[in-house]
UniProtKB/Swiss-Prot annotation:
Involved in the biosynthesis of branched-chain amino acids (BCAA). Catalyzes an alkyl-migration followed by a ketol-acid reduction of (S)-2-acetolactate (S2AL) to yield (R)-2,3-dihydroxy-isovalerate. In the isomerase reaction, S2AL is rearranged via a Mg-dependent methyl migration to produce 3-hydroxy-3-methyl-2-ketobutyrate (HMKB). In the reductase reaction, this 2-ketoacid undergoes a metal-dependent reduction by NADPH to yield (R)-2,3-dihydroxy-isovalerate. InterPro entries: 6-PGluconate_DH-like_C_sf, KARI, KARI_C, KARI_N, KARI_prok, NAD(P)-bd_dom_sf. Mg(2+) 2 binds at D191, E227, E231. One of its GO terms (molecular function) is ketol-acid reductoisomerase activity. It comes from the Bacteria. The active site is at H108. Its cofactor is Mg(2+). Residues 183-328 form the KARI C-terminal knotted domain. Binds 2 magnesium ions per subunit. It comes from Cyanothece sp. (strain PCC 7425 / ATCC 29141). Keywords: Amino-acid biosynthesis, Branched-chain amino acid biosynthesis, Magnesium, Metal-binding, NADP, Oxidoreductase. This is Ketol-acid reductoisomerase (NADP(+)). Substrate binds at S252. Mg(2+) 1 binds at D191, E195.
Amino acid sequence: MARLYYDADANLDLLSNKTVAIVGYGSQGHAHALNLRDSGVKVVVGLYPGSKSAESARLEGLTVTSVAEAAEVADLIMILLPDEVQKTVYQQEILPHLKPGKVIAFAHGFNIHFAQVVPPADVDVIMVAPKGPGHLVRRTYTQGEGVPCLFAVYQDASGQARDRAMAYAKGIGGTRAGILETTFREETETDLFGEQVVLCGGLTALIKSGFETLVAAGYQPELAYFECLHEVKLIVDLIVEGGLAKMRDSISNTAEYGDYTRGPRIITDETRREMEKILYEIQTGQFAREFVLENMSGKAGFTAMRRREAEHPIEEVGKDLRAMFSWLSKR
């Protein structure tokens, strides 16, 4: 069984008298920067000129500079930018300032694993990937807790890359919850697979198909929305808290029986074969090449898909229903 590492296993002193550059100040960026700062680490935030996030970072008392300036002064550079822009920013703003002994870090292995970013041989290359959104990484830290993280070493030029990755994970609160060692390849391929087959692609396709089936059969769209989308969170919360067993222990016998007898008719052997094809596309780099080329060509197809999905009837029904949820408007 995989081992989890905790506070006692990591040495935050490895970051003392060091400067950490956080490149990007979005969901993960703001959480990493603030948590490290509150852990006693010297932090500088690197942003492009005119970034709307600069003022937010300054209001938190953080030092904000250009990406190039941050990369120049930092000992450890954590890149927390969208996958599709990392290569350009790295080549133009970061690479010229990478000196022997520095550390370049990522929260996802995409650009390293698929060779979009190829660091020089004399720097450490590490990954620390919180398994939760940035607001949760920050909130749990302020509560004295943390979000579990994955960590990995791609290149160990200093002989301390692993310890440095664990120290960084401790600085953002990860070792409070537990951190799990992996590789860039394993994290990248499993993360993409989970997103495409289950969490995003699979789930949204299932929700829409269920909604469309009920509406086509003459049921009210509002009821279809409740049954196929709204209640997903209620079920997922139970699964997260105690696995599939707790969920099944919490639902009615009718629902549980339907789970066992009808679920396998939805996820069939044909579905599993398609899952295997998608995994193969990830492993061979086919998906990565497709995604990179889509962005290089201006994202016309991506933009069209976004527009089409935004116009799906479930979105309009959901918008009207959510406006009536008093408990939701208070969040």
